[in-house]
């Protein structure tokens, strides 16, 4: 399947520290050419505002919501063209866009490869950064401005999420980890990966995101899931993490599924990679996994059903049954929050 690179140089969920340069850096490192997508789609990003929104306490929520809708449009067009979207951030907040695009189509899963839980509640986030909240936000926890995009809260159900590679180093990590484990989210933390191996970790994640009642899944790769000694080019460093080989094995297995609908890569800060060596390794990781995807004309489901052009997207809530033939209009009742 042909890939389509979508550049989303957004620092709105964190800060403009250099991660917004990642798409251009990866292009210069040859990623776009290697993926066969020299003509990337680029999403415009509003100016960064370092003053918190008074209603939500979050930095740049309106800008993040606007970027999410624009990204959703680009992902939607890419899928309708039968291509595989590869999003390059930017910070973690860009995950809202592809999940909104998929949510408009139906019910999808999320394979969330991340060294952090990203499950803070906005009231507990000291800096107002959505980057610490993104998994909470996409599962419907937080202000309506971000959690109820297009009236479709949640973008993904807890039971349809697999968090892989998360590691615990301090009391806050432990608290968030315990909170996540009290939900229906599947957690495959770093300790479990090391204990059972990447094969079992992959099997557990796929069991969650390829359930028969899901129409596919999205893959979020936060590069801080990698070992800090190998990936120091991130703003919030965190000791330990996956090796390049472990990350390749897990990501390859996820993307080899014909249920995978796209990949998003976030948080790489090229200003912390002065010789460009990390950018080259990251290009290798992305190309070596994306290019192993099954051949085909488009994102066909394993049951053979996939409408090539969606004239009507589903706008039902995720706690309602999703019929095979979908249409506009039903809003239903949202899932409970914390």
Cite the ranges covered by each PLM segment.
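Short, glycine/polar-rich helix-capping loops at beta-to-alpha or helix-loop-helix junctions
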Residues: 169-181
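Gly/Ser/Thr-rich loops at beta-strand to alpha-helix junctions
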Residues: 12, 91-95, 169
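Ser/Thr/Pro/Gly-rich low-complexity, intrinsically disordered segments
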Residues: 310-311, 320-328
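Short, structured patches in soluble enzyme cores that scaffold and shape functional sites
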Residues: 112-115, 139, 160-168, 189-191, ...
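Catalytic cores of soluble, metal-dependent hydrolases
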Residues: 3-86, 98, 179-310, 314, ...
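Active-site histidine-anchored catalytic micro-motif
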Residues: 80-149, 158
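Short, intrinsically disordered C-terminal tails of secreted or membrane-associated proteins
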Residues: 331-336
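Active-site flanking residues adjacent to catalytic metal/cofactor-binding acidic residues
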Residues: 6, 90, 113-115, 164, ...
């Amino acid at each position: 399947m042909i890939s389509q690179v979508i550049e989303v140089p957004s620092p709105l969920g964190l800060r403009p520290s250099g991660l917004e340069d990642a798409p251009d850096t990866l292009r210069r490192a040859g990623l776009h050419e290697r993926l066969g997508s020299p003509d990337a789609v680029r999403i415009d990003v509003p100016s960064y505002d370092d003053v918190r929104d008074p209603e939500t306490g979050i930095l740049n929520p309106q800008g993040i919501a606007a970027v999410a809708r624009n990204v959703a449009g680009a992902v939607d067009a890419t899928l309708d063209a039968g291509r595989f979207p590869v999003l390059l951030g930017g910070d973690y907040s860009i995950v809202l866009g592809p999940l909104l695009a998929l949510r408009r189509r139906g019910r999808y899963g999320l394979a969330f490869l991340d060294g952090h839980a990203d499950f803070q509640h906005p009231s507990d986030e000291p800096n107002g950064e959505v980057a610490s909240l993104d998994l909470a936000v996409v599962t419907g926890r937080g202000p309506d401005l971000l959690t109820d995009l297009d009236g479709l809260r949640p973008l993904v159900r807890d039971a349809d999420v697999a968090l892989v590679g998360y590691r615990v180093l301090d009391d806050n990590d432990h608290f968030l980890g315990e909170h996540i484990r009290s939900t229906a989210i599947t957690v495959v933390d770093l300790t479990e990966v090391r204990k059972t191996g990447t094969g079992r970790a992959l099997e557990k994640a796929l069991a969650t995101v390829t359930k028969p009642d899901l129409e596919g899944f999205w893959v979020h790769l936060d590069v801080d899931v990698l070992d800090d000694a190998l990936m120091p080019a991130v703003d919030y460093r965190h000791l330990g993490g996956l090796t390049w080989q472990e990350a390749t094995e897990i990501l390859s297995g996820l993307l080899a599924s014909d249920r995978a609908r796209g990949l998003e890569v976030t948080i790489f800060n090229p200003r912390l990679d002065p010789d460009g060596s990390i950018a080259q390794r990251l290009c290798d990781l992305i190309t070596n996994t994306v290019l192993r995807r099954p051949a085909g004309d488009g994102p066909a489901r394993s049951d053979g059903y996939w409408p090539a052009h969606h004239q009507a997207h589903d706008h039902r809530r995720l706690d309602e049954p999703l019929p095979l033939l979908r249409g506009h209009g039903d809003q239903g009742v949202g899932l409970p929050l914390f």
